[in-house]
Structures are given as C-alpha cells and as structure tokens.
Amino acid sequence: MALKQKGTDAAADPKKRRRVGFSGIDAGVEANECMKVFIARNPDEAGSANSTSLQPFDLNHFFGEDGKIYGYKNLKINVWISAISFHAYADISFEETSDGGKGITDLKPVLQNIFGENLVEKDEFLKTFSKECEYLSNVVTDGNVIKHDASIDEDSAVEIVRVELQGAAAFLYCRLVPLILLLVEGSTPIDITEHGWEMLLVVKKSAQASSSSNFLVLGFAAVHHFYHYPESTRLRISQILVLPPYQGEGHGLRLLETINSISESENIYDVTIEDPSDYLQYIRSSIDCLRLLTFDPIKPALCSMVSSLKDTNLSKRTSSLKMVPPSDLAETVRQKLKINKKQFLRCWEILIYLNLDAEDRKSMDNFRACIYDRIKGEILGTSTGPNGKRLVQMPSNFDEETCFAVYWTQDGGDADDQTVEQQPEDLKTQEQQLNEVVDSQMEEIVEIAKNVTSRGKDKLSVSCSV
C-alpha cells in the first residue's frame, strides 16, 4: 500500500509565509468519489487507469456511518486486484492532511477490513502474477469438470469445475471474498468450516505457452448442501458472481444451468437461492420458464387456465379466478425439475402470460386482476377495512417511492389508542399503492416473458395455442 503526499509551493519555498486563518469544519469526502477499484490481468495493467474498472455497489458503507473520509486534501485511492491471484495493491495520494474537527481517517485498517491478507505492497503484487499462477491450476486439477464449452477463440476454452470448499479451494474462496464484499450488496463471507459447501468455478483455459497462468477465473457460485427430512438433501445457492471483465458473456446462465443439471442427476430435493438480486432472479426465472415450456405434465392445467382467462369476465368483479396451479402439479415439478414451489408459482404466471394474446384486452385485464388479487391477499390478507391490515407508503433511506409498510388496526380499546381511522381517502391511497406494486410485478413478468420468447421461440410453438 503506497502513500504519496504531493508537495506544495509553501513547503518548497520556506520564505513564503502562510496566512493565519480559521477554516470551517471538515466536510469530508465520500469514498465513492475518491476511491476506484480495478482488475489487472497482467503486470502491465497494474497501476494503470486503463485497467478494467469495477463498479462496487457502495464504497461508502465501509467508511463509518456517514461513509466519508476526513482529514485529506485531494485524496485519491486506486486499488488494483490481480485477476490471477486476487491479491490487491492500493495506491493512495493526497496533497496534505489536517484535522478539520473530524479527525484524520486512518485508511489502512479500513482497506485491510475489505481486502484482508490479500492487500500487499506493489513489488509483491507484481510478483504474484508469476509466483501465484500455479495455485489456481491445482484447484482446477483437483476438481471435476462439469460442463465444457468451446470458445470462439482457438487457443482457449471455458469450463465449469466443481470443487469442495476445503484445502486449496477454500484458500481460493478466501481470496475471492473482497470481490464479493465489493460487488454483491449485503453479502457476508460464508463459513467454509461448515460441512456441505462446494464451489462451481467458471474458468478459462489458455492453450498459449506464453500465458502466465493456465487458467483464469471468470466467475463462481458457492452452494450448500443441507439435510431435508426425512432422507434427502436441498441445494441452496448462497453466492454467485461473474467478474466484471467477463459479464454479459453468459457465464452466470451456464452456472445456473449446471446447478440445475446437478440437482436433477443427484436427485436433490429442490434448489433455492439465498436473497437473489433482481437480475439474478430475472435470469433464474427465464431459465426455469424455458425448462417448463417443454415439461409435458404442466400443459393440460396451463391450457385450462389460459382458456379460463379468455372466457371469464373479471372486470366487473362479479366473479373471481385464482391463477394457481394444482398442488399435485407443483409437487411433480419439484420432483422432476427440482424447482421449489415458490419459484414455480412465479414461473406459472409468466407461462400463462406467454400464452395470452397481448392484444386481447379482456384476457390481459383478467390476468392483471388475478395478479392484483394475489398481491392484495399476500400483503393485506383477507381482513381489510376499519379493522384489518393496511398498506401505506413509507419514506426510507433506500427508495422513497417504492417502500411500503403494513400495519394492523382494530376496533375497541381506549380512544387514545385509536390513532388511525381508515377514511375514504385512505382507502383511495391504499388502492393506488397496491396498483403501483401490481404494475411493478407486471413489468417484471413482461420483461422475463420477452427474454423467454427471444431464447425459446421453438419451445413456444408447442405451448397452448392463442
């Protein structure tokens, strides 16, 4: 970690006198504004601003409650992470330091908290490109190749390798932790000492003799096998990450497909994902919908539901229709495809949408009405009105427009306790907020349906006719 303090004119000329004055309280600088993180794939990229830049979700949260750094003028923190060994080197420069009332932030412990033992000095960092290149080869050699995709480049190939999180593989995971902390919001390192952890690595093998390393890690997934009563195993995807230089190339898709293949071949009970991001859920639902499109057991129930949405008139609310599959069908899907019930219900709505004519106003209104009823039931339950659940929009530090709270009101009690009465205007606001949630979910369904359509036109041809 290099610290560089730039000289000033006053320091260069001792005859110049500084004027005495009183400066204001140091406002500090946000870490997001002065810190950048790069990936270096070779020694030439180390220390270069031309390296691939990472986009951490939020660097501020590493620097105290307000996310600011104090006591530095024109502070710049540039960190390079080796794509070979995942060691890190930090270059820190500033013009001067001064205590403006908030102290001077000690940068070293904060960076060590992020990068741990990966953080080294520049000379050692440069040596890791040649000295550390074999350890990844050892991890890959000890693992099992699950999937092999020939690359468009003649000198390389992409493989997915399955390794147990112990020994060298556990050591590799520890080196990947800083990337997880930087790029996955709300993430925490897994406990690799716990039984049942393994990792799927997306690696690129180089056939070039001049390459400093035989393999590059493009991405990975950490999965956990845990007991399910009475005598089966569930598989949970805890973390999945494709490194920024290789995102958009389909590696995350390959990881999920490989996990699905493992779950079927080993008769896992089902597959779940721990706190998936919106984009990961988008990819997951697209994959599962494509699998379900060719799963014959769902077609009779799916076509029946599509037909009901075409024929029923829900606009006047004189009738109701629950857009749910038969319970035995959800169990069949779990047994054969290892899709858990919650995920299947999500995909079920997308499959129905795919089989409706978007130009048929009646069908689409009925579809939206079913989505509305489901969401209203999930949020408010069956008890609404003067004494029941209520949905209100609440400001938050994350998003003032899309955060809601649910609370319960009831009749009776002291007058002082009845601080909330549901007036007509309250019901109108609640209806508006419910519709906003419904609109958001409708947008998600439409986007996933578009992706499924673009990737599976041949599979859609054998679905229910519209």
From Swiss-Prot:
Record-level GO BP terms: subtelomeric heterochromatin formation
Query: Where does this protein reside within or beyond the cell?
Result: Nucleus; Cytoplasm
InterPro entries listed in its UniProt record: Acyl_CoA_acyltransferase, Hat1_N, Hat1_N_sf, Hist_AcTrfase_B-typ_cat-su
EC number(s) from the headed UniProt entry: 2.3.1.48
GO MF entries: histone H4 acetyltransferase activity
Q: Which CDD domains match?
A: NAT_SF
Q: Where is this site: Interaction with histone H4 N-terminus?
A: W197
Q: Does the keyword RNA-binding apply?
A: no
Q: Which residues bind acetyl-CoA?
A: I240, L241, V242, Q247, G248, E249, G250, H251, G252, L253
Coiled coil location: none
Please provide the record's keywords in A-Z order.
Acyltransferase, Cytoplasm, Nucleus, Transferase
The positions flagged as active site in the entry are: E274 (proton donor/acceptor)
> Does Secreted count among this protein's keywords?
no
One annotated Gene Ontology cellular component of this protein: cytoplasm
- What reaction does this catalyse? L-lysyl-[protein] + acetyl-CoA = N(6)-acetyl-L-lysyl-[protein] + CoA + H(+)
Sequence similarity: Belongs to the HAT1 family.
Q: What does the function comment of this entry state? A: Acetylates soluble but not nucleosomal H4.
- What name does this protein carry? Probable histone acetyltransferase type B catalytic subunit
Q: Which organism is it from?
A: Oryza sativa subsp. japonica
- Which lineage? Eukaryota, Viridiplantae, Streptophyta, Embryophyta, Tracheophyta
What's the gene?
HATB
